[in-house]
Amino acid sequence: MRKNGSRCLKRSKKRCASKRKPAFSIRDTASFVCSAPNKEEKSDMSLKLHIVLFEPEIPQNTGNIARTCACIGATLHLVEPLGFRPSERNLKRAGLDYWDDVKIVHHASTKAFLDEHSADNLYFFTGQAERSYAEVDYAGEVFLVFGRESRGIDPEILERFAARCVRIPMKEGLRSLNLSNAAAIGAYEALRQNGFSGLV
């Protein structure tokens, strides 16, 4: 009788153990793989995204960025002087038929733009920054600022706004990513943090 009783006890313990929730499961890893916040978390600070190009030189890049802005609902800011005419064929071709769906704001100079906007809303993308673009908490009205393809953002501006500078990590020894790719990377990180609100 004792042997049978001990067997029953062991079986009941096994059943209980099988019903217990494991301390860690594969599902739990989801929070480590992608930590995008719930949409409700930033509902009081809905993202208003702007992409700013300081004196862009290559029309195809600007056209591609305009298309990205149209697809994500961002405003595109073009800061003069531009390295091309607004009627440039390559500019229109790169943006395809998305031009009617993007809001574009022109600024006479970098000074005019900087005088008009608070530094608290600006993030300057440069390879000289120490902080990664992914370490920033993007909320509210956000301006992602990019410099010229050939020289980037002027050193005096980077020095003035050193605390607002971020970089996109890349392999050591190489100069930079393509401008339109960099703009898309920065924009989609801001959108990811806000649960891609408004997108499908």
For the regions a language model picked out, list residue spans one by one.
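Post-transcriptional modification and biogenesis factors for structured RNAs
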Residues: 5, 9-10, 19, 27-200
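Acidic/His-rich, metal-assisted hydrolase cores and their charged scaffolds
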Residues: 22
